[in-house]
Amino acid sequence: MEQDVVAQTTVGQPYTAGTWVVQSGQEDEFIERWTAFTSWAKREARGALSFVLIRDVDEPTRFQSFGSWESAADVAAWKSTPEFMLYLGRCRELCDDFQAANYAVASVITS
């Protein structure tokens, strides 16, 4: 994990999140597509800081994703691009369920 990103996290900082339930047998393809999606975002989207995808150990078709951003305006601009819908759609077509959410950091504890 990029320690410097965590250390720079501040209260109120925007995060995007997704809960993904992937079709059985499609997990590796989903990880590849999600990685392409977020690699594009990191390169091209203003204010994109970091992305992480975590997998449920007990239910391996269930994933959570998080993206940290400089501002809510950056998130809105990212979501308004045609590429966003294309990449998101490629991930979603491998899923039985997907829920998106927008968050703001409420508390930060670092070592």
Task: Describe these PLM feature segments.
Residues 1-13, 50-61, 87-111:
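Glycine-rich beta-strand-turn "strand-cap" elements at beta-sheet edges
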Residues 21-31:
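Short, surface-exposed ligand-recognition loops at beta-strand->loop->(often short) alpha-helix junctions
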Residues 2, 36-49, 68-102:
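An amphipathic, aromatic/His-enriched active-site/gating alpha helix that lines ligand/cofactor pockets
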Residues 14-21, 50-79:
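Short, well-ordered beta-strand segments in beta-rich or mixed alpha/beta enzyme
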Residues 26-28, 73, 111:
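Residue-level signal for secondary-structure boundary sites
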